[in-house]
């Protein structure tokens, strides 16, 4: 099964990205393919310069680990990146700047789509 997850809120203000990561982990354990589409403020979580304190979760690193396992992609709204001053050299390895055409394709091709937006 192909699962699409869209997140729209900042990574450390709300727990939507944590929820998306947990859903992705569970789905991948069952052999499903997961695509995460980051829109609006959620694009901040792909900034590899984020340095959370020792006791907090490192969301960018968690996304890298999921991509390394396979069957997991991260797409980032390019306009949202530009709006927030995030450049391609700042984003985590493996993530893909994309846009609304890719989101539309994801909606058309996935079996399930989850939208997390606080």
What are the roles of these predicted feature ranges?
Residues 3-18, 46-50:
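Short, glycine-rich nucleotide/cofactor-binding loops
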Residues 84-86, 90-115:
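C-terminal structural segments of small proteins and small subunits
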Residues 17-30, 34-36:
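Histidine-anchored nucleotide/phosphate-binding helix
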Residues 52-80:
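A glycine-rich helix N-cap at a beta->alpha junction
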Residues 5-6, 35-39:
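Short, conserved beta-strand edge motifs with alternating hydrophobic and charged residues
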Residues 42-56:
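N-terminal beta-loop-helix "entrance" segment that forms/cooperates
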Residues 2, 32-35, 73:
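Residues at the starts of beta-strands that form the adenosine-phosphate
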Residues 40-43, 80-81:
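Short beta-alpha junction loops
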């Amino acid at each position: 099964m192909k699962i699409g997850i869209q997140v729209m809120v900042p990574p450390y203000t709300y727990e939507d990205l944590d929820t998306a990561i947990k859903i992705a982990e569970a789905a991948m354990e069952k052999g499903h393919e997961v695509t995460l589409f980051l829109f609006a403020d959620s694009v901040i979580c792909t900034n590899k310069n984020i340095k959370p304190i020792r006791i907090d979760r490192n969301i960018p690193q968690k996304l890298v680990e999921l991509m390394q396992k396979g069957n997991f992609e991260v797409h980032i709204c390019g306009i949202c990146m530009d709006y927030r001053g995030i450049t391609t050299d700042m984003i985590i390895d493996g993530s893909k700047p994309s846009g609304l055409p890719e989101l539309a394709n994801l909606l058309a091709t996935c079996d399930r789509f989850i939208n997390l937006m606080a």
